[in-house]
From Swiss-Prot:
Protein name in the entry: Protein YdfX
InterPro entries: YdaT_toxin_sf
This protein's encoding gene: ydfX
Misc note: Encoded in the Qin prophage.
């Protein structure tokens, strides 16, 4: 079954409403899932964790804004394409 961007957006919204989940934590998990994909789409998602496990706060902020304030809106063709490309990472992060 193919997941639509709208379905992924609903799953993402429900996921971040769970106790203890924040946009920042979700961004970290989505970003890690994105970088773990065997075939990554060509969208600008920055790594947010250093080798030692420390968080790059600047990259985290940039990715959070892109995912939650821009791409999730899917109100333009560009945003829809980027959010659609991110769907596999979102689904892996929300179910993994």
């Amino acid at each position: 079954m193919k997941i639509t961007p709208e379905q992924a957006r609903e799953a993402l919204d429900a996921w971040i409403c769970r106790p203890g989940m924040t946009q920042e934590q979700a961004t970290i998990l989505i970003t890690e899932a994105f970088w773990a994909l065997k075939e990554r789409p060509n969208i600008d998602v920055q790594r947010v964790t250093y080798e030692g496990g420390a968080i790059d706060q600047r990259a985290l902020g940039v990715n959070r804004v892109k995912i939650f304030e821009r791409w999730k809106a899917i109100d333009t063709r560009d945003k829809r394409e980027k959010f659609t490309a991110l769907v596999p990472a979102i689904m892996e992060a929300t179910t993994g």
